[in-house]
Regions:
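Short acidic-aromatic low-complexity motifs
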Residues: 1-23, 53
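Short, cysteine-centered beta-strand-loop-beta hairpins and adjacent loop/turn segments enriched
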Residues: 82-93, 121
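A solvent-exposed, acidic/Ser-Thr-rich amphipathic alpha-helical stretch
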Residues: 21-69
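A generic structural micro-feature
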Residues: 55-59, 70-74, 91-95
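Hydrophobic residues on conserved beta-strands that form the core of alpha/beta folds
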Residues: 60-62, 77, 112
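Short beta-strand edge/turn micro-motifs at domain boundaries
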Residues: 75, 96-123
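Hydrophobic/aromatic beta-strand elements that line small-molecule binding cavities or substrate pockets
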Residues: 44, 48, 62-67, 80-82, ...
Length: 123
């Protein structure tokens, strides 16, 4: 599987409300989301479990995915519309976001080693 296919599979899993931690390397450093910072593989896994537990009805629309692979490393950037419902606060969220990050090949799979998601105007 290519790095690009892994990213698209991650988007599909996010839409479907499936577990996401397996997409990250065991030694993943950090995942930045809108308003959050998850550090280390345990922190990333816990944050993603909580996200899956407390959200539903995801829309993930990729508008400009660009991926570069070189050897066992890959990096990417994308403009993504993300929308979801928070089932605890009963709020709907809808954002145009920018994604970037790095992946490392492990055997036949790619795993994220870092990811950054931001919305224009984030502070």
């Amino acid at each position: 599987m290519s790095a690009e296919a892994t990213i698209e599979e991650y988007y599909d899993a996010l839409r479907a409300g499936e577990p996401l931690a397996a997409f990250f390397a065991a030694d993943a450093l950090v995942k930045f989301g809108i308003g959050e910072r998850l550090e280390g593989s345990d922190g990333i896994a816990a944050g993603l479990r909580e996200q899956t537990r407390t959200t539903e009805d995801w829309i993930v629309e990729s508008h400009d995915l660009r991926v570069m692979e070189e050897g066992e490393w890959a990096w990417f950037a994308d403009d993504v519309r993300m929308a979801w419902d928070d089932i605890e606060s009963d709020e709907h969220h809808d954002h145009r976001t920018r994604w970037s990050g790095g992946l490392r090949r492990t055997d036949d799979d790619w795993r994220f080693v870092g990811m950054h998601v931001s919305a224009p105007g984030d502070s």
